[in-house]
């Protein structure tokens, strides 16, 4: 039976590799395993060994490193010799089994079956379900949007879907503050990454927002960006012995990069390196800070302009157009499409021409009759349509309400498609989006302690009092008296303690200017008053901040108060709390709005109570009064705050330095009057049609509801738990819809992505994930699930299995073969062909006569009748039935080959129908809307042609198989 030189593998120790017989007698056989440098002696009667024999069509490796494509297998005196052609040169070659590579592995299902590498039946089932789920997720229209750790806000989802599915989107996101521009950008990016259209992304932000973006992308989207600054880049700077620069481009080292635009403006060399690197998508936050004028664009604007010209996809996040002024607004649009927005004066003329149409839309939205002028404006824009019958339906009192509604909606749809900037500009306002709470301001006036008064006097005599010293006197006092503690006498602390005790059942967020202030406050509350508190500042790691946030979010045993520095709270929202204490007042309106915005979000269920303790006759009091009575910035959002701060800032500075100066009341009146004027101009300039397009209406609402239905999906929960079990992760149900996942010593892989060293808590519940940022929110989009599916489907888990079928109606010993084939196409990721033809599992269930019973016998139904087989019995069945199994595999190949044309035809029809419809729509609209870019249409047509070509090349491969043997019991 055994001949010296033959190759065998161990059924019980597959990891030893390919063994070679070195000795054999009547009782034992000795096998050496060169790859593992091990030797085993087996008793002949129970040797767990399987003979290795490759087949025609296999590609095998020689011990010398070259590969042979097997064309013929010859056996001579117990030895196997393989004949064929070398893969590298095509020359004919001979490879005796003695010269096979010792590290051979079996990846084909049939090879694994016949080499005793047989898996458990439940793993075969998990593999098939993983393939099914993978197919479904590739085709899901919700992919890239449902996994976000955020509330499902219809207008955000609408913009994300509309823009995220485009080829190389170039848009301006200009929602009002608090409406989620960052979330919209993240969802657009996520879809582009999932589709493969985008791989390398650069995010440019003001320096103060870098960490906010880093946190938002990680916590909300599971996207791990890298922060680039001078210190990081300098590590790549190198010179040779002659002093020549041989530096590598640091920006080529990571795919997802965040950088400060302020830093790049001041560092020409780094800006040059950014331009030299290739990017698929550019995202610019606070883009309105890029100063532009027709004759003198800023350095930052010119840099972004060059970058935008060489980057296919561009997202600009900016303040609303009305805040910017038309010239600045035009400059942003020109970055997106310089050919379309080439002349400022032409743009202004076009905007003026369009205003009457926007007014007419407001009339339509209010269900009022259209005036003669409004009808003319609409008819002129829709010149190719006969609008007269539509106007009659709208204006006639005899028209049925439902008919009027239908016509109004049709007209609005037509006008949206022709809107001047509707494809490049999205803007929602708070007036157009429901769900915001009221804001209530409480000013607490306290007497300034003598210690602060004296410190300010002394510093004044020394000529060194700064604005920060007066706004934050505790820092000045501590600097001058290191041994003393400001917290021992500051009346704000006693007020805060009393306030917390009077509101024990409420969550309260306290924001301070500095981390040191927050740390000192939290220590006093916790140690002196035993108040459950947490601290949150920029010196903490993201994990530490997550824990603090989670402690604050717990309703029963959690912290009553979270004390945060202003920088530490960036990127975090706490809408489950409704009390905000501004222990230190921000020194400009934008920062004030940012602080209030931590609570003032969509999803906030209560009115927000804003408490500002400040000292009487102080700079704090002047600033708080100006914010409240001049800007009304505490009780309403103030989109014109930055403009008013620029306009009145110098005059305000005088009152800040001298709080008791005459004329302050008159100054407040003038500020408020100007605020009302700007507010009216903003309202007058609102483009209702643009808002309607950006809002998404009922379609957006339906999208949110569809995603909500997928939350806590039982199929996902069951699959995830089975997946974790197979991977070897320990699971502990904590209740409250959360599970602790812990690594063990018997995992399939040493490190599973997303699992911490000790443990990770996960949930399938969106609301819990929103409250507890230390808990991972699992959806089909989460890396833990996606990586788990990849681990199963790309590896050998469940590729071959053998089971017993308990069925009294079948003769004992009846052989069935369940084969899972994959139909797929090897196309560039950027084509996003998985929408039409994802890797598709096709199940074939053959009886012993070769008839396919898959349509009659469901996978789940069959699974319930199967029983496991131990490994020894499975190996025995595989050996005994090898010839019959091979025949059934041959028949299954004929079956899948017959099914392939139908699958290709359906995918081709889907692709052609979808892409042709979009192409027709864009081509039709291009005649009436200049914002349809010619290159976008060309790219779509090329995509259609290439997609159909690649789908036609689709083929099949055997992924996994299960042999089933019937038994009566």
Swiss-Prot record:
Record family assignment: Belongs to the SNF2/RAD54 helicase family. RapA subfamily.
Purpose: Transcription regulator that activates transcription by stimulating RNA polymerase (RNAP) recycling in case of stress conditions such as supercoiled DNA or high salt concentrations. Probably acts by releasing the RNAP, when it is trapped or immobilized on tightly supercoiled DNA. Does not activate transcription on linear DNA. Probably not involved in DNA repair.
Motif residue range(s): DEAH box: 285-288
Enzyme Commission number(s) of this protein: 3.6.4.-
Species name: Actinobacillus pleuropneumoniae serotype 5b (strain L20)
GO molecular function: ATP binding; DNA binding; helicase activity; hydrolase activity, acting on acid anhydrides
Protein name as catalogued: RNA polymerase-associated protein RapA
Domain Helicase C-terminal: 492-663
Domain called Helicase ATP-binding: residue spans: 162-339
PANTHER family recorded: DNA ANNEALING HELICASE AND ENDONUCLEASE ZRANB3 FAMILY MEMBER, SWI_SNF-RELATED MATRIX-ASSOCIATED ACTIN-DEPENDENT REGULATOR OF CHROMATIN SUBFAMILY A-LIKE PROTEIN 1
Keywords linked to the UniProt accession: Activator, ATP-binding, DNA-binding, Helicase, Hydrolase, Nucleotide-binding, Transcription, Transcription regulation
Annotated residues for binding of ATP: 175-182
SUPFAM superfamilies: P-loop containing nucleoside triphosphate hydrolases (SSF52540)
Keyword Mitochondrion: no
Subunit structure: Interacts with the RNAP. Has a higher affinity for the core RNAP than for the holoenzyme. Its ATPase activity is stimulated by binding to RNAP.
SMART domains, sorted: DEXDc (SM00487), HELICc (SM00490)
Domain of life the protein comes from: Bacteria
Listed GO biological process terms: regulation of DNA-templated transcription
């Amino acid at each position: 039976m055994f001949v010296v030189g033959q190759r065998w593998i161990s059924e019980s120790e597959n990891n030893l590799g390919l063994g070679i017989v070195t000795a054999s007698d009547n009782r034992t056989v000795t096998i050496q395993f060169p790859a593992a440098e091990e030797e085993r002696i087996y008793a002949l009667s129970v040797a767990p060994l399987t003979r290795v024999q490759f087949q025609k069509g296999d590609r095998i490796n020689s011990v010398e490193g070259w590969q042979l494509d097997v064309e013929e297998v010859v056996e001579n005196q117990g030895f196997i010799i393989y004949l064929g052609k070398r893969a590298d040169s095509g020359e004919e070659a001979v490879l005796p089994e003695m010269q096979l590579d010792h590290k051979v592995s079996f990846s084909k299902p049939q090879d694994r079956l016949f080499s005793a590498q047989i898996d458990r039946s439940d793993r075969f089932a998990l593999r098939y379900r993983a393939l099914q789920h993978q197919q479904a997720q590739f085709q899901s229209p919700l992919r890239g949007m449902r996994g976000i750790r955020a509330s499902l806000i219809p207008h955000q989802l609408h913009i994300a879907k509309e823009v995220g599915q485009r080829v190389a989107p170039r848009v301006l996101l200009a929602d009002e503050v608090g409406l989620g521009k960052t979330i919209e950008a993240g969802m657009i990016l996520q879809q582009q990454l999932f589709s493969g259209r985008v791989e390398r992304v650069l995010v440019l932000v003001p320096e103060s927002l870098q960490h906010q973006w880093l946190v938002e992308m990680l916590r909300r989207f599971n996207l791990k960006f890298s922060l680039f600054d001078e210190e990081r880049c300098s590590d790549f700077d190198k010179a040779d012995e002659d002093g020549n620069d041989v530096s590598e481009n640091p920006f080529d080292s990571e795919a997802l990069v965040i950088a400060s635009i302020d830093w790049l403006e001041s560092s020409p060399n780094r800006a040059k390196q950014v331009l030299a690197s290739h990017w698929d998508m550019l995202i610019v936050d606070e883009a309105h800070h890029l100063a532009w004028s027709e004759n003198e664009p800023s350095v930052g604007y010119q840099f972004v302009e060059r970058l935008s010209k060489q980057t296919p996809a561009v997202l600009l996040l900016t303040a609303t157009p009305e805040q910017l002024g038309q010239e600045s607004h035009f400059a942003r649009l020109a970055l997106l499409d310089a050919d379309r927005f080439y002349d400022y004066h032409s743009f202004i003329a076009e905007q003026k021409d369009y205003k009457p149409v926007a007014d007419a839309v407001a009339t339509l939205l209010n269900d009022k009759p259209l005036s003669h002028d409004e009808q003319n404006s609409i008819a002129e824009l829709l010149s190719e349509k006969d609008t007269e019958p539509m106007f009659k339906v709208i204006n006639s009192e005899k028209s049925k309400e439902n008919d009027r509604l239908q016509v109004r909606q049709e007209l609005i749809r037509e006008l949206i498609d022709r809107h001047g900037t509707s494809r490049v500009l999205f803007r929602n306002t708070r007036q157009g989006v429901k769900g915001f709470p009221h804001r209530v301001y409480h000013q607490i006036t306290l007497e300034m302690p003598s210690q602060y008064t004296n410190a300010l006097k002394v510093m004044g005599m020394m000529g060194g009092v700064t604005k920060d010293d007066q706004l934050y006197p505790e820092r000045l006092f501590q600097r001058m008296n290191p041994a003393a503690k400001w917290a021992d006498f500051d009346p704000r602390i006693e007020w805060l303690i009393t306030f917390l005790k009077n509101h024990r059942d409420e969550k309260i967020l306290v924001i301070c200017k500095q981390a040191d202030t927050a740390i000192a406050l939290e220590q006093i509350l916790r140690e002196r008053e035993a108040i459950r508190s947490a601290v949150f500042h920029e010196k903490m790691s993201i994990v530490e901040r997550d824990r603090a946030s989670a402690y604050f979010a717990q309703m029963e045993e959690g912290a009553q108060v979270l004390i945060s520095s202003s920088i530490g709270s960036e990127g975090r929202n706490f809408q489950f709390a409704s009390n905000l204490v501004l222990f230190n007042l921000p020194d400009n309106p934008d920062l004030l709005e940012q602080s209030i915005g931590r609570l003032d979000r969509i999803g906030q269920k209560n009115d927000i109570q804003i408490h500002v303790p400040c000292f009487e006759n102080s700079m704090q009091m002047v600033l708080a009064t100006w914010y409240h009575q001049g800007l009304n910035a505490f009780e309403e959002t103030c989109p014109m705050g930055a403009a008013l701060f620029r306009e009145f800032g110098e005059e305000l500075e005088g009152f800040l330095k001298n709080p008791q100066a005459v004329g302050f009341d008159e100054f407040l009146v003038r500020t408020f009057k100007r605020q009302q004027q700007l507010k009216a101009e903003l309202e007058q300039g609102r483009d209702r049609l643009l808002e309607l397009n950006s809002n998404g209406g009922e379609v957006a609402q339906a999208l949110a509801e569809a995603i909500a239905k997928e939350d806590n999906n039982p199929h996902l929960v069951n699959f995830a738990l089975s997946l974790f079990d197979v991977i070897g992760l320990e699971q502990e149900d904590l209740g409250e819809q959360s599970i602790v996942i812990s690594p063990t010593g018997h995992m399939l892989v040493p490190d599973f992505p997303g699992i911490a060293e000790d443990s990770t808590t996960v949930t399938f519940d969106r609301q819990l994930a929103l409250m507890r940022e230390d808990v991972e929110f699992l959806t089909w989009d989460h890396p833990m699930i996606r990586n788990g599916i990849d681990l199963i489907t790309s590896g050998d888990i469940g590729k071959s299995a053998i089971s017993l079928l308990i069925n009294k109606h079948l003769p004992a010993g009846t052989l069935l073969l369940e084969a899972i084939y994959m139909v797929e196409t090897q196309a560039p990721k950027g084509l996003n062909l998985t929408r039409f033809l994802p890797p598709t599992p096709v199940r074939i269930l053959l009886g012993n006569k070769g008839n396919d019973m898959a349509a009659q016998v469901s996978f789940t139904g069959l699974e319930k009748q199967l029983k496991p087989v131990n490994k020894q019995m499975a190996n025995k069945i595989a050996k005994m039935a090898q010839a019959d199994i091979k025949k059934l595999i041959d028949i299954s190949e004929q079956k899948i080959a017959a099914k392939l044309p139908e699958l290709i035809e359906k995918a081709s029809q889907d692709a052609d129908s979808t892409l042709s419809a979009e192409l027709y729509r864009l081509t039709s609209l291009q005649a009436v809307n200049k914002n349809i870019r010619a290159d976008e249409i060309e790219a779509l047509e090329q995509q259609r042609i290439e997609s159909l070509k690649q789908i036609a090349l689709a083929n099949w491969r055997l992924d996994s198989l299960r042999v089933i043997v019937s038994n009566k019991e």
